[in-house]
Amino acid sequence: MMSSKPTSHAEVNETIPNPYPPSSFMAPGFQQPLGSINLENQAQGAQRAQPYGITSPGIFASSQPGQGNIQMINPSVGTAVMNFKEEAKALGVIQIMVGLMHIGFGIVLCLISFSFREVLGFASTAVIGGYPFWGGLSFIISGSLSVSASKELSRCLVKGSLGMNIVSSILAFIGVILLLVDMCINGVAGQDYWAVLSGKGISATLMIFSLLEFFVACATAHFANQANTTTNMSVLVIPNMYESNPVTPASSSAPPRCNNYSANAPK
């Protein structure tokens, strides 16, 4: 015998998740489109994502989005580069002047070294070896490279200035020895007195300029070596504490929801 009571079925509520969660500043029932973006949060996110640039000499920060680290170069790089730029120009000009003086006095030494009939001229081993000419040319090249490197400050010019100044310092040291020999071997009988006197004076002058060139070349090579080695130092990498994504999700201050419905939603 069947009962006349209607069969009661459990009420089934189909819950559909809401793809547009309401926020605190939106009216109930108003849904925010997926494509809309909070411009204020986007601007704040872009400011937080961009690392701060450091303008101190020798320190550079990475500002490309998507990178997780900030690269910083050792601060001593800026000091070494500034020292080289300040000193290399003045020292290079001195080297050029010394080179021109060597070539000029070398021509005079060549003229007084000739013998006329039975009268001997000034015997110069420096002229025989050609030191006033190839030495002066080397000094001019070193000075020109130093001046160019102080203006453009490229790695190639700095290395070239370093190499040429080392060569010039060696040549200047050799020239000092040759000029000392010239001052010692002259003054024998049969030489022209005025030629010997002039030759010794010119040799002494060139020796002073050679000593000056030696110290100037060593100083320039020192500054160039500092500028070259400090730029090859390892780069300090600092982890970026900020998020690289310039768009940050809007913070929701909506009240807690029960069964996918807001607590203050109209019933």
Curated annotation (Swiss-Prot):
According to its record, how does it sit in the membrane? Multi-pass membrane protein
Main localisation, per the record? membrane
Transmembrane domains' residue ranges:
92-112, 121-141, 161-181, 201-221
Q: InterPro entries, alphabetically?
A: CD20-like, MS4A
Cytoplasmic compartment ranges equal: 1-91, 142-160, 222-267
The subcellular location is: Membrane
- Judging by the UniProt lineage, the source's domain of life is Eukaryota
**GO terms, biological process:** cell surface receptor signaling pathway
For side Extracellular, which residue ranges? 113-120, 182-200
Intrachain S-S bonds: none
Say yes or no: keyword Lipoprotein present.
Answer: no
Q: Name one Pfam family in it.
A: CD20
- Entry keyword Lipoprotein: no
The segment annotated Disordered runs over 248-267
Key words, A-Z: Membrane, Receptor, Transmembrane, Transmembrane helix
- Which Gene Ontology CC terms are recorded? plasma membrane
This molecule's function is given as: May be involved in signal transduction as a component of a multimeric receptor complex.
> What does the sequence similarity comment in the record state about its family?
Belongs to the MS4A family.
Please report the name of this protein according to its UniProt entry. Answer: Membrane-spanning 4-domains subfamily A member 12
The organism named in the record is Homo sapiens (Human)
Originating gene: MS4A12
